[in-house]
A protein has these predicted regions:
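Beta->alpha turn/N-cap motifs
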Residues: 1, 44, 170-171
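Alpha-helical substrate-recognition element adjacent to the catalytic core
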Residues: 1-23
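Short, structured coil segments at secondary-structure junctions
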Residues: 2, 10, 107-109, 163-164, ...
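A short acidic, helix-capping loop that chelates divalent metal ions and anchors anionic groups
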Residues: 7, 14-15, 120-122, 177
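Conserved strand-loop elements at the edges of beta-sheets that form or border functional pockets
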Residues: 8, 115, 187
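Conserved acidic, metal-coordinating active-site core of Asp-based
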Residues: 27, 31-34, 38-151
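Mg2+-dependent phosphoryl-transfer enzymes with acidic/Ser/Thr/Gly-rich catalytic loops
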Residues: 122-202
Length: 202
């Protein structure tokens, strides 16, 4: 959830969670519906909820998270019954930029809106990113950011890479992410994270 939720991997307990205001779902869906081929996704613990036009990028998100897509007729009613850490808007990059411009104009004062990839537009509570939540986690266990190594490849990883004592970009990372990193490792397909562990943690 890009920093909106911290879960204890041993117990499954949610340590920290921040949610979107429910009243943003309807106006966001209105924006999405203006553009053919654009989808909006919400997340449960087991599935992705689709309110727009399911596309190849929604399928990509489904594959990445090992979660099926469930298409619902009334997206707003469905998602406002639950707490939502984030929405993801997916589609062709040029259309995503148009959606982004509209969303920023309407919600800039209380949402965080950015592209994690050219085809993924993240809609988050304001002030939330991976660095924010990792800093909270470090504080809870008595460590500083100097002790943290972060690996990433997308725009949504920038803040944590810049905050970490050692910020690492994958070889397949976006150019700006590479520019911001202290170290560039091998690609995801070449076990780049394992390379970092072997290089810096043994």
């Amino acid at each position: 959830y890009n920093g909106c939720r911290i879960t204890d991997c041993r117990s499954g307990e949610i340590i920290y969670s921040k949610y979107l205001p429910n009243d943003v779902a309807a106006p966001l869906l209105e924006i999405v519906k203006k553009y053919p081929g654009i989808d909006i996704l919400a997340y449960t613990d087991t599935e992705l909820i689709s309110g727009g036009d399911t596309n190849e990028y929604s399928e990509k998100e489904s594959f990445i998270n090992h979660m099926p897509i469930t298409k619902v007729d009334d997206f707003v009613s469905y998602v406002t019954k639950n707490n939502n850490n984030k929405f993801l808007i997916t589609g062709e990059p040029e259309l995503i930029q148009e959606v982004k411009a509209e969303a920023e104009k309407q919600f800039h004062s209380y949402l965080s809106i950015y592209c994690s990839d050219p085809f993924f537009l993240e809609i988050m509570p304001q002030g939330i990113d991976k660095a924010h939540s990792l800093t909270k986690l470090l504080t809870s266990i008595g460590l500083s950011t100097d002790a943290m190594i972060c690996c990433g490849d997308g725009y949504n990883d920038l803040a944590m890479i810049e905050t970490a004592g050692l910020g690492v970009a994958m070889e397949n990372a976006q150019p700006l992410v590479k520019e911001s990193a202290d170290y560039i490792t091998k690609s995801n397909d070449e076990d780049g994270v394992l390379h970092v562990i072997n290089e810096f943690m043994r």
